[in-house]
Amino acid sequence: MAMYEEIGRLLKLENSPVAICLEEEQSSSRKRFMGYAPASCSFWRLGIDSAFYTLDSDHNCSIGKVTHGFRSADEVKENDDVRLLTSIGWISMDEISKLPRLPKSMVISYISVDKLKGEGSRGEGEVVKEMPNIALITFFCNAEQVMLVVDAAERAGIEYRIRSRPTCAILAEAYSIKGVVIGLGCT
């Protein structure tokens, strides 16, 4: 965990980074997400203060279902949100079919790094006692912090990319290149 703590310290992050785990089965040490999240990327911010897992049915954005490995582009093409976004020209079905995708998983967990450190004082949820298999780390940065991340990646020879919409694709792209992807947002 020292590496994640060091990243947060050096960047002077306002919020804890969030560990993202791709799992085949539900963890007994984490609670299932309860509530409504409009899009898959919403879980990243919710994970700042908590530890929980999500299933396919918790992800309410069809494009997020594709990038998070729950559905194929063909499976979501008739969904209302996809039809709306393609009809206004925000994205095409061809673009959706070419988006990076996380490996197919049954469960995606989001865990505040503070919970992994055993700090449990922020937000709700239990402190995570066992170390999960972390696939990705996400954190929210301002422009100065992004500059430091890019500089560090360049100096270390780590591939990095910048992506606009859809932001949910940054996880799959980072996983694929085993590097850093900076998301600029969807709108």
Predicted regions and their residues:
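Acidic, serine/proline-rich low-complexity intrinsically disordered regions
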Residues: 2-187
